């Protein structure tokens, strides 16, 4: 009977996830995942994007209360904008909450001034992430007082669908965007492993409002997908599958790959062959200094091999317990599907 584990163990797996933040802000990041089986870049990229933009918990202002104002079709004395415009501006305020319970913030301002989000009295449990965001223009000698309620939630909740059905008279519900992720884009490019050049490389660009860092947002989205997909695994692994998994924990199966299967220059390949380096496991146990002492092996060859090892999440100078194993040829054959 075909081993069930071959359905997933024989697929190539990503050996690295690289995060690169943009210099101007920590709220934007480029995430690169490679290598992936052909088609998996689009599959994972689309799934991650949908979860990132819909399912993460965040905080938002859900209602406001202004003295003597009962609905959004009113005007506020001394305020240039009408209430509907003020509400639209308040929807753009980005908040971060350090507690799960709702909090009420207060705003007091005296004109003439431009009222901004930074003027809101938040307390210790709430943080305004864009304090320069403009709320309204207040005329000279006029005062503005307002209470703003913020809560934790997910997604986009319309004021008409608000879970606060019994708001007090004078408290106005507003549309709430809880999601801390502002934008997600992705693209898929080809990447190379050995002689195969059409594996997928997934490149994602994620921007948040600062409530969570992009790296954390991506991790949370992956965890949500993992939790949702777990239910579909309705079988038990066979004993040989469990044994293979246990054996694989000793060291990476990539160490069993022969170095002559790597796409090396003729000079580098000959140097390794002359130094009796047969498997990648033999190679990674050497230090860079050891390699540079090899006859005819220079810095160019060293950098070439380092780049290839990095694709497998390997490096020179690794400590590999019990290497080489006694049955190395048998193991290399058994795990051939895992690294090819």
Swiss-Prot record:
EC number, as in UniProt: 2.7.7.6
Q: What class of enzyme is it?
A: transferase
Keyword check for Transferase: yes
Region feature (Alpha C-terminal domain (alpha-CTD)):
251-340
Q: Enumerate the residue ranges of region (Alpha N-terminal domain (alpha-NTD)).
A: 1-236
Q: Which family does it belong to?
A: Belongs to the RNA polymerase alpha chain family.
Protein name per UniProt: DNA-directed RNA polymerase subunit alpha
Name of the coding gene:
rpoA
């Amino acid at each position: 009977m075909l081993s069930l584990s071959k359905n997933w163990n024989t697929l190539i797996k990503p050996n690295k996830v690289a995060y690169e933040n943009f210099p101007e802000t920590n709220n934007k990041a480029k995430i690169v995942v490679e290598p992936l089986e052909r088609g998996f870049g689009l599959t994972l990229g689309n799934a991650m994007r949908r979860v990132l933009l819909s399912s993460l918990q965040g905080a938002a202002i859900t209602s406001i209360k202004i003295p003597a104002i009962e609905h959004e079709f009113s005007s506020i004395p001394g305020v240039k904008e009408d209430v509907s415009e003020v509400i639209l501006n308040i929807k753009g305020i980005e908040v971060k909450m350090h507690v799960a319970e709702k909090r009420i913030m207060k705003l007091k301002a005296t004109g003439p001034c431009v009222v901004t989000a930074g003027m809101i009295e938040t307390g210790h449990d709430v943080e305004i992430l864009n304090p320069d965001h403009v709320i309204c223009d207040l005329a000279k000698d006029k005062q503005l007082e307002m209470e703003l309620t913020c809560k934790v939630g997910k997604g986009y909740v319309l004021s008409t669908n608000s879970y606060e059905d019994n708001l007090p008279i004078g408290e106005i519900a507003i549309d709430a965007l809880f999601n801390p992720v502002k934008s997600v884009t992705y693209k898929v490019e080809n990447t190379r492993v050995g002689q195969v050049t059409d594996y997928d490389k997934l490149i994602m660009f994620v921007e948040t409002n600062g409530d969570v860092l992009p790296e954390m947002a991506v991790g949370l989205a992956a965890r949500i997908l993992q939790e949702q997909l777990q239910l579909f695994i309705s079988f038990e692994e066979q004993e040989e599958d469990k044994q293979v998994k246990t054996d694989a924990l000793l060291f990476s199966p990539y160490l069993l790959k022969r170095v002559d299967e790597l796409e090396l220059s003729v000079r580098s390949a000959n140097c390794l062959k002359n130094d009796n380096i047969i498997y990648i496991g033999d190679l990674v146990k050497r230090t860079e200094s050891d390699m540079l002492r090899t006859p005819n092996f220079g810095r160019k060859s060293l950098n070439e091999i380092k780049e290839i090892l990095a694709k497998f999440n390997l490096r020179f100078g690794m400590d590999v317990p019990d290497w080489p194993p006694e049955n190395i040829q048998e193991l290399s054959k058994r795990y051939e599907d895992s690294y090819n």
